[in-house]
């Protein structure tokens, strides 16, 4: 996590508690929408990293000899694309394979955003609730589009109260508030899950770093105390960085992508089941007519 995102405050005025963009929730007096935050710089760095990655892949692919083995980097990128394409086809259908670039880019962007905190002075974009909420909004819009595409009018009927008459369900024009809340739940769940995990790692590392500084603060020689704190923190914290930045960061990016797959697949599967039920009812009706005739 970025040291700039871990700011502390002592009684003499030195910052010791995380505050930038985390606990400042006053939207009127303290809100400065035009003031860039640390995460904005992190987003720019991630963009440069991914752009460089794709340019290197494109150049290596153009220079590659089809009669010879490709480089490890080219093979890794191709394997990643094939995995994303197969996963897209398996979960949301062959007809939606055109969404493969989106899911692949989403995975690379999230993993890069989480790992960028390993670079000193750069805050991970995912430590900003605005950033994760924007990604969650894209997932939510995809849910709505998939629902309308496969369920048609049934998607809108799911937001109203249904009544059952003689075993058949009929939709009313009365809105069901619980259905609306349930539809918006994935938006908040997927956004807060990612943000909470990254922010939690940031806070734990902040506490761990400053524990060693406080442990040696009783020494009369302040420069020596700070030096010893930095040495012990530098020796013991790499394992925590590997877990919170690399393991958790990569895992949370993968989880976000798979949840997006599942939410979209749910809308598609409901629509396909309704279509199959309608086709089965029509087939039964035709069979009944043939028997009567």
Swiss-Prot record:
It is found in: Cell membrane. It comes from the Bacteria. PROSITE patterns: ATPASE_A (PS00449). It is a multi-pass membrane protein. The chain crosses the membrane at residues 39-59, 73-93, 102-122, 128-148, 172-192, 198-218, 224-244, 245-265. GO terms for cellular component: plasma membrane; proton-transporting ATP synthase complex. Coiled coil: none annotated. Keywords: ATP synthesis, Cell membrane, CF(0), Hydrogen ion transport, Ion transport, Membrane, Transmembrane, Transmembrane helix, Transport. The keyword Transmembrane applies. GO terms for biological process: proton motive force-driven plasma membrane ATP synthesis. F-type ATPases have 2 components, CF(1) - the catalytic core - and CF(0) - the membrane proton channel. CF(1) has five subunits: alpha(3), beta(3), gamma(1), delta(1), epsilon(1). CF(0) has three main subunits: a(1), b(2) and c(9-12). The alpha and beta chains form an alternating ring which encloses part of the gamma chain. CF(1) is attached to CF(0) by a central stalk formed by the gamma and epsilon chains, while a peripheral stalk is formed by the delta and b chains. HAMAP family: ATP_synth_a_bact (MF_01393). Belongs to the ATPase A chain family. Key component of the proton channel; it plays a direct role in the translocation of protons across the membrane. This is ATP synthase subunit a. It comes from Mycoplasma pneumoniae (strain ATCC 29342 / M129 / Subtype 1) (Mycoplasmoides pneumoniae). The gene is atpB.
């Amino acid at each position: 996590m970025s040291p700039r995102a871990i700011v502390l405050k002592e009684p003499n005025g030195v910052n010791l508690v995380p505050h930038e963009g985390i606990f400042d929730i006053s939207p009127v007096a303290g809100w400065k929408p035009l003031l860039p935050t640390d995460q904005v710089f992190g987003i720019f760095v991630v963009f440069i990293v991914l752009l460089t990655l794709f340019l290197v892949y494109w150049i290596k692919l153009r220079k590659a000899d089809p009669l010879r083995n490709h480089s490890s980097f080219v093979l890794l990128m191709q394997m990643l694309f094939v995995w994303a394409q197969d996963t897209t086809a398996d979960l949301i259908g062959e007809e939606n394979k055109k969404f493969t670039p989106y899911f692949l880019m989403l995975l690379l962007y999230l993993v890069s955003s989480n790992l960028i905190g390993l670079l000193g002075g750069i805050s991970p974009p995912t430590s900003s609730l605005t950033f994760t909420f924007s990604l969650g909004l894209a997932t939510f819009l995809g849910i709505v589009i998939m629902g309308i595409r496969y369920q048609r009018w049934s998607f809108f009927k799911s937001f109203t109260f249904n009544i059952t008459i003689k075993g058949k369900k009929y939709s009313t024009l009365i809105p069901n508030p619980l259905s609306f809340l349930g539809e918006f739940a994935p938006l908040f769940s997927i956004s807060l899950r990612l943000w909470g995990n990254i922010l939690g790692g940031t806070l734990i590392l902040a506490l761990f770093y400053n524990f060693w500084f406080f442990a040696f603060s009783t020494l009369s020689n302040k420069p020596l105390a700070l030096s010893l704190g930095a040495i012990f923190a530098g020796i013991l914290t790499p394992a925590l960085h590997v877990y919170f930045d690399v393991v958790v960061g990569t895992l949370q990016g993968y989880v976000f992508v798979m949840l997006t797959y599942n939410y979209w697949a749910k809308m598609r599967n409901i629509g396909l089941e309704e279509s199959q039920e309608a086709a089965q009812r029509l087939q039964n009706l035709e069979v009944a007519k043939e028997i009567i005739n």
